[in-house]
């Protein structure tokens, strides 16, 4: 059990750090290109590992190969939904909902489809971690701003009343951001849960390395094909942005490889690996606190305490 938790936590640290760095690259080259570059770099790294260590290619039958490629498509969409949600929706809604619901969806799929079983203690502790992760991302002060914020400019609001049409438009924009943020975060979580489920099927049959190669390769192909078909502007990043992208790609695929290896040795503890990998949202919160000096709200401290308590319960009753 300790091993499953450790690998889940390691993947959370790597994924959370990579996602935290995406703010700057997304501003520089956009979310779509950031996704494409991160997936491509994530494809190169495991291939290099396989060549360096002379890893033997496992036997792929057609259904497993198609499943692996399909997961790459879901991986691409999970990134796009997340980045669009953070940009076009309310961040104070997208971040906690995504961090909390993705592991929840995945655990449900593991139990229903893969037949994974949980003891009552494990089920309660996993629920505690998921709730804690969700609470740790909630910032009521920012949430209030997001709900009250409107997308319609009111330049002369101090001198004259806004027309009824303007007020209706403002209400529509406010509602749109809240609903769109929630919709996209749930779509991201559902896509991520499907990827987790697919990896739970592939890794026991193909090992932990090669599914990551195909997953990232398919994700990169889909990303750049989308950019081409959608006629998005292709931009070569400057040196600083490229270095950030390279670091993000290495951290992201590092998290995937650690996650995959955790799955390969977890056995019936697969839900624990997935649940604790969901702490990537908490890692982003800690990075924001250290770099931007964002103070924790009381409810966030409660969420962190709940996560630590749930983890301690799991370790105590192992």
Where are these regions (language model features)?
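Specific alpha-helical transmembrane segments that line the substrate/conduction pathway
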Residues: 70-75, 83-134, 210-218, 268-290
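Hydrophobic alpha-helical transmembrane segments of multipass integral membrane proteins
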Residues: 13, 40-47, 123-133, 190, ...
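Hydrophobic alpha-helical transmembrane segments in multi-pass integral membrane proteins
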Residues: 46-56, 106-118, 189-204, 251-268, ...
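Aromatic-anchored, glycine/proline-accented short structural segments
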Residues: 188-233
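Membrane-interface interhelical linkers
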Residues: 1-13, 22-33, 37-73, 77-89, ...
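Hydrophobic/small/kink-forming positions within alpha-helical transmembrane segments
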Residues: 16, 20, 47, 72-77, ...
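C-terminal appended segment following the main domain
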Residues: 254, 259-318
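Loop-to-transmembrane alpha-helix entry segments
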Residues: 62, 98, 115-135, 139-150, ...
């Amino acid at each position: 059990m300790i091993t499953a938790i450790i690998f889940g936590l390691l993947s959370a640290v790597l994924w959370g750090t990579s996602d935290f760095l995406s703010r700057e690259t997304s501003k520089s080259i956009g979310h779509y290109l950031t996704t494409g570059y991160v997936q491509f770099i994530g494809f190169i790294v495991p291939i290099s590992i396989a060549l360096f260590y002379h890893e033997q290619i496992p036997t792929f039958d057609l259904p497993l190969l198609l499943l692996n490629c399909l997961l790459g498509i879901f991986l691409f969409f999970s990134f796009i939904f997340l980045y669009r949600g953070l940009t076009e929706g309310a961040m104070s809604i997208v971040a906690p909902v995504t961090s909390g619901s993705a592991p929840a969806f995945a655990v449900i799929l593991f139990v229903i489809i893969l037949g994974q079983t949980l003891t009552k203690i494990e089920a309660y502790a996993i629920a505690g971690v998921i709730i804690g992760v969700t609470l740790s991302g909630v910032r009521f002060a920012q949430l209030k701003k997001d709900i009250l914020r409107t997308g319609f400019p009111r330049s002369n609001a101090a001198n004259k009343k806004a027309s009824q049409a303007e007020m209706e438009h403002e209400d529509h924009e406010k509602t749109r951001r809240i609903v769109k943020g929630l919709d996209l975060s749930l779509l991201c979580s559902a896509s991520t849960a499907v990827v987790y489920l697919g990896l739970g099927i592939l890794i026991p049959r193909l090992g932990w390395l090669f599914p990551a190669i195909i997953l990232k390769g398919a994700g990169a192909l889909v990303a750049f094909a989308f950019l081409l078909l959608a006629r998005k502007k292709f931009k070569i990043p400057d040196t600083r942005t490229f270095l950030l992208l390279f670091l993000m790609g290495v951290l992201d695929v590092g998290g995937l490889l650690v996650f995959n290896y955790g799955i390969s040795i977890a056995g019936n503890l697969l839900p624990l690996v997935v649940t604790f990998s969901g702490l990537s949202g908490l890692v982003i919160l800690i990075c924001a606190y250290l770099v931007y000096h964002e103070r924790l709200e009381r409810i966030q401290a409660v969420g962190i305490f709940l996560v630590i308590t749930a983890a301690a319960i799991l370790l105590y009753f192992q």
